[in-house]
């Protein structure tokens, strides 16, 4: 069954799986192999679209120093685009550049963050660059986690910039959300989704091992997140139980993959060379200096192995000992621990831990593995006629909204706590048949089971309208936005947060240039006609002054627009 040699007996107890050093909401541990620059092109933050470039501003990490103004707190200005030179003959539908939801702000004084958030003195985690603390937004009352990074301790600015860029691209139920980025003279602040349920590692220590069904529920979420990021040519490179958090302490709490500091772009047929990772979970090809996305599959296989038996497949007295065994890639299923584990589970582990990474199972094929299919049927959620009708009505309501309101609701859906979407999150996952973290129209059709051809055509058009970023798929936030309870739109703090995303320079109005800053044409970044942008503005601009002020914006959002 398993191609690996059976001559590497378990060394006994789980030795130093994690050296507890007060951490670890951010996932930095002493056993993590020292990082170095990738052979892939360095990615830094550009002013508008975060495109790739190589120049580094050593004074500021998220913003150019020229953005500093006399005001105490200043948002990044939108790109100055001359509307008049745009092609007036284009009649294109604008799409939403959703990376703009993550706001970047320069703080003029070191204490300005505490005017926005009430910071808890208790540390959620501690890493090599700084601490992670719980924080309460003083306007909305929402709880977040803030990763406070001491800029003096940063030894790889490009890695940090790449982490921010990659997190801005993520939109998956099991990947930690980045909400905001702040920077002052001394520190960088990453405002993140708060997870209060602890690490998967701690659950392993507490329970020792998990049943196959409990293991399936965890691995399903891990593989879904990997399928999502691999489809975007992103690899994590440091997947381990310490970097997997539970959202809350409930028995059915979802998990979140955190710490994308070692993540990198890896295009198809492209190999990386940098040696990064953690000894227990690192793939042997990384140690050899030539690897691709499937290094994450190896790490996942190690996690699955540990969940089922309570100890790692490659164990040792110290890191050198562990790495020697990883290089050999030999492991066994000790009958003392594995006799009651199914053959299908062992086969999947062997496919994940295939020493030849080119032959290792692809993440998109795992969902069709026998072991996965068996448990998927146990956990099948039926979309009944009542829910089907309810969803179609929500999609129709969303379709009728003006363009800016659709985009603003998308911003709100991204910012809200996951607990607000418990039912819809499960519905999204039920629709996601292939487990890749996004929905196709075909997947939604299959679940809604709409048989009437005329309704099918109408539904197809409605579903196309949900795709606000124009990537041809219904992403997690897009689905939640269409299902959002509109009563929340009457909350002033919620609307102000959404308004801020469009009002890039913070002057209280949304201009044509600022609207262009968050819009694009499909994935081609083509310009819009002057008429398209003006029409989007006119839908909300009650006094016809060419701008959208907050009063107009709030009336639109709350449904009080005349």
UniProtKB/Swiss-Prot annotation:
Top-level taxon in the UniProt lineage: Eukaryota
UniProt motif (J domain autoinhibitory motif) ranges: 394-402
Residues that bind Ca(2+) 4: 541, 543, 545, 547, 552
Activity modulation notes: Activated by calcium. Upon calcium binding to the EF-hand domains, the C-terminus of the junction domain (J domain) undergoes a conformational change which results in the dissociation of the pseudo-substrate inhibitory motif from the catalytic domain. This, in turn, may facilitate the autophosphorylation of the activation loop at Thr-278, which leads to the kinase activation.
Binding residue positions for ATP: 124-132, 147
EC number: 2.7.11.1
Protein name, as recorded: Calcium-dependent protein kinase 5
Organism from which the protein derives: Plasmodium berghei (strain Anka)
Gene that specifies this protein: CDPK5
């Amino acid at each position: 069954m398993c191609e690996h040699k059976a001559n590497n007996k378990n060394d006994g107890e789980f030795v130093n799986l994690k050296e507890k050093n007060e951490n670890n909401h951010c996932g930095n541990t002493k056993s993590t192999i020292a990082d170095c620059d990738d052979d892939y092109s360095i990615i830094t933050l550009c002013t508008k679209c975060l495109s790739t470039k190589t120049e580094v501003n050593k004074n500021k990490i998220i913003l150019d120093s020229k953005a500093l103004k006399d005001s105490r707190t200043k948002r990044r200005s939108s790109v100055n685009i001359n509307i008049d030179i745009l092609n007036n003959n284009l009649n294109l539908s604008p799409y939403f550049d959703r990376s703009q939801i993550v706001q970047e702000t320069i703080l003029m004084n070191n204490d300005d963050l505490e005017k926005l958030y009430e910071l808890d003195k208790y540390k959620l985690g501690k890493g090599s660059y700084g601490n992670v603390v719980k924080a309460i937004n003083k306007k909305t009352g929402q709880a977040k986690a803030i990763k406070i990074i001491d800029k003096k301790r940063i030894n790889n600015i490009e890695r940090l910039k790449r982490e921010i860029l990659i997190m801005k691209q993520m939109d998956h139920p099991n990947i930690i959300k980045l909400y905001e980025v702040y920077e002052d003279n001394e520190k960088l602040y990453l405002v993140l989704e708060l997870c209060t349920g602890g690490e998967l590692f701690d659950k392993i220590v507490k329970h020792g091992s998990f049943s196959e069904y409990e293991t399936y529920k965890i691995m399903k979420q891990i593989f879904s997140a990997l399928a999502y990021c691999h489809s975007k040519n992103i690899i994590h490179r440091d997947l381990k139980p310490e970097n997997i958090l539970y959202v809350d302490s409930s028995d059915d709490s979802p998990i979140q993959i955190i710490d994308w500091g070692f993540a990198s772009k890896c295009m198809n047929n492209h190999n990386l060379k940098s040696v990064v990772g953690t000894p227990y979970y690192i793939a042997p090809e990384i140690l050899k200096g030539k690897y691709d996305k499937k290094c994450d599959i190896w790490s996942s296989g190690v996690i699955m192995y540990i969940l089922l038996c309570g100890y790692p497949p490659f164990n040792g007295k110290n890191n050198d000992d562990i790495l020697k065994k990883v290089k050999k890639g030999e492991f066994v299923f000790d009958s003392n621990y594995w006799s009651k584990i199914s053959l299908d589970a062992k086969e999947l582990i062997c496919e994940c831990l295939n020493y030849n990474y080119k032959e290792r199972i692809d993440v998109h094929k795992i969902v069709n593995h026998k072991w996965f299919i068996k448990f998927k049927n146990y956990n099948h959620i039926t979309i009944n006629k009542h829910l089907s009708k309810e969803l179609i009505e929500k999609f129709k309501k969303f379709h009728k909204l003006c363009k800016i309101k659709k985009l603003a609701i998308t911003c709100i859906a991204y910012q809200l706590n996951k607990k607000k979407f418990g039912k819809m999150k499960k519905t999204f996952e039920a629709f996601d048949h292939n487990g890749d973290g996004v929905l196709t129209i075909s997947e939604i059709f299959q679940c809604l089971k709409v048989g009437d051809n005329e309704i099918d055509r109408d539904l197809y058009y409605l579903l196309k309208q949900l795709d606000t970023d124009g990537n041809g798929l219904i992403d997690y936030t897009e689905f939640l936005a269409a299902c959002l309870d509109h009563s929340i739109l009457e909350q002033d703090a919620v609307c102000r947060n959404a308004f801020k995303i469009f009002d890039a320079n913070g002057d209280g109005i949304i201009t044509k240039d600022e609207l262009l800053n968050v819009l694009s044409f499909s994935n081609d970044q083509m310009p819009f006609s002057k008429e398209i942008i003006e029409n989007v503005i006119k839908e909300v601009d009650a006094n016809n002054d060419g701008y959208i002020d907050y009063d107009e914006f709030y009336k639109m959002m709350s449904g009080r627009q005349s």
